[in-house]
Structure formats: structure tokens, C-alpha cells
């Protein structure tokens, strides 16, 4: 093909803290769920570590689900730590949606030197160098909705094909303007 497409391979680590509610203590079947909108690039999910225990993640359509059991003695108001990792392959961009119920921090580090930060929420800190970039978003439930997203688009700045096309279009424009003005 004459066109190059930007693809990425990423290792995603998700961790956090979930407060236990009175309703979840009483319920027998508690589920931990997360959604991946484009499942094609998703691979190698780890087990979910939840409250010091490990649980298998299983796929249900676009969601991954684990039936979880609270640690002995857990009560409403306690906070449970969770973590899991997976590999994600994709093209052109990587976006995240913040949690509606708490604070969300997303940190991205890459060796790609041409990021374009996109979405309703821009990074709080970012550092772009010739050998890559780092960016961090910190979002609270007060300044986001479930529809806000944040992420990065991997831009290919003016490759030779784009430059040739641009030159041809501007050349035609100048020729047309000369004839119209004359």
C-alpha cells in the first residue's frame, strides 16, 4: 500500500479503589464490569485482583465481567482495591471515559513523538519530546459526565503523500485564481 497507517501496541493497567455500599454488602451476586467498545484489539486480560483475591474475567458482548466476593469482615464504607492489565492494539487513537462516581486519573506514556490530545477533557500535564510523550489527566466526578472522553490521536505530520497532494491542490488554486482575476 502507498499509505502508512499508524498502529499501536499498548499495555494497559487499570487500578482503583471502590467504596463498598450497603446495597452491595447485602447482595449475594456482586459483579465487577468494564467495557471495551472495540474488542478486536483486546488481548491477554489478566485476572482481576479485587480486595486481595483473584477472580477470572469473562467476556459478555462488549463487557468483561467478574463475579466478586468481598473479603471477610468487609462492611459498608470500606474501600476495596482492584487491579488488572491487558494488551490493546489499535489504530490512530486511544480514548478513555472517566468514572461517573469518583475521581479518575489516566497516565499515558509513549515513544511516539507526534500526539494530538483530543476529547472533551485535555490533559492536566503533558510533556512532548522528540523521543515520545507523557500525559496525565485527573478528572473528578464534579467536572465530568459519563459522555466526556479523553485521549490521544497519533498524528502523522505531513508525510510526502500529503505534501504532494497539498502542492497539487494549491497549484490548481493559483492557476484558477490567475484566470478568474484576468
Residue spans for each PLM region:
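Juxtamembrane membrane-water interface segments that cap and precede transmembrane helices
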Residues: 150-159
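Generic secondary-structure transition motif, activating predominantly at the C-termini of alpha-helices
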Residues: 139-141, 156, 168
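Core alpha-helical transmembrane segments of integral membrane proteins
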Residues: 159-182
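Soluble non-transmembrane domains of integral membrane proteins
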Residues: 1-148
Amino acid at each position: 500500500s502507498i499509505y502508512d497507517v499508524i498502529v499501536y501496541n499498548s499495555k494497559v493497567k487499570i487500578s482503583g479503589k471502590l467504596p463498598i455500599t450497603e446495597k452491595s454488602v447485602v447482595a449475594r451476586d456482586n459483579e465487577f464490569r468494564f467495557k471495551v467498545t472495540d474488542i478486536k484489539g483486546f488481548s491477554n486480560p489478566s485476572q482481576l485482583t479485587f480486595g486481595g483475591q483473584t477472580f477470572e474475567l469473562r467476556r459478555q458482548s462488549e463487557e468483561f465481567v467478574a463475579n466478586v466476593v468481598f473479603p471477610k469482615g468487609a462492611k459498608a464504607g470500606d474501600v476495596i482495591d482492584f487491579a488488572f492489565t491487558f494488551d490493546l492494539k489499535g489504530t490512530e487513537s486511544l480514548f478513555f471515559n472517566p468514572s461517573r462516581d469518583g475521581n479518575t486519573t489516566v497516565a499515558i506514556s509513549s515513544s511516539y513523538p507526534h500526539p494530538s490530545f483530543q476529547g472533551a477533557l485535555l490533559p492536566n500535564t503533558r510533556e512532548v519530546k522528540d523521543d515520545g510523550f507523557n500525559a496525565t489527566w485527573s478528572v473528578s466526578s464534579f467536572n465530568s459526565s459519563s459522555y466526556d472522553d479523553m485521549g490521544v490521536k497519533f498524528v502523522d505530520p505531513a508525510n510526502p503523500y500529503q505534501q504532494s497532494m497539498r502542492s497539487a491542490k494549491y497549484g490548481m488554486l493559483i492557476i484558477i485564481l490567475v484566470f478568474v482575476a484576468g
